[in-house]
């Protein structure tokens, strides 16, 4: 079994591939997901990565953007690509990678869960309450209410994500780091 530890916005993600020779079916888990007894499985077919929650086979929602970015980053590094397509709730979005900076394209008209509280610091910065991972609905609402410019830095726990607005699409950019990788052998 091969494993990789990735880091994004000060959160750790563990990626495991049981079939080492193919690396087409991988399972992703984080500390927060472990507390909620959840893990994702990502199936890679041709140029697509499809996600679903392991425990109930439900499709993964857009709220787990950090996990999506980590798996996309891993895929592009393993297969030496600079772009890939991600499927979330049967909707495709594109992801690009330059060195360790991952950019995910998100459609503006898609629906997202709206957190109850958000705080605009100034026209370029906004923060989310502790425990909220998704910056997209906050950014979308603030942009439409003319509280933010086209580019904003979202401050999340331990890190920052850059959000950019262009052609009715939102682009989320954030650095992802490969902490280490290894192999677990059966004894």
Predicted regions and their residues:
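A glycine-rich beta-to-alpha transition motif near the start of alpha/beta enzyme domains, typified by
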Residues: 1-99, 115-187
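Intrinsically disordered, low-complexity regions enriched in acidic/Ser/Thr/Pro/Gln residues
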Residues: 103-106, 113
């Amino acid at each position: 079994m091969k494993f990789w530890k990735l880091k994004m916005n000060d959160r750790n993600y563990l990626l495991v591939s049981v079939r080492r020779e193919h690396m087409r079916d991988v399972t992703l888990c984080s500390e927060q997901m472990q507390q909620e007894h959840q893990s994702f499985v990502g199936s890679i077919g041709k140029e697509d990565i499809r996600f679903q929650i392991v425990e109930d086979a439900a499709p993964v929602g857009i709220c787990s953007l950090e996990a999506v970015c980590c798996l996309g980053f891993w895929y592009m590094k393993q297969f030496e690509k600079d772009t890939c397509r991600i499927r979330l709730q049967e909707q495709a979005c594109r992801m690009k990678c330059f060195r360790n900076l991952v950019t995910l394209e998100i459609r503006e008209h898609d629906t997202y869960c709206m957190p109850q509280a958000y705080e605009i610091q100034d026209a370029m910065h906004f923060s989310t309450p502790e425990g909220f991972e998704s910056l997209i609905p906050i950014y979308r609402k603030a942009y439409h209410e003319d509280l933010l410019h086209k580019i904003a830095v979202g401050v999340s726990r331990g890190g920052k994500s850059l959000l950019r607005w262009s052609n009715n699409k939102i682009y989320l950019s954030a650095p992802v780091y490969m902490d280490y990788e290894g192999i677990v052998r059966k004894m």
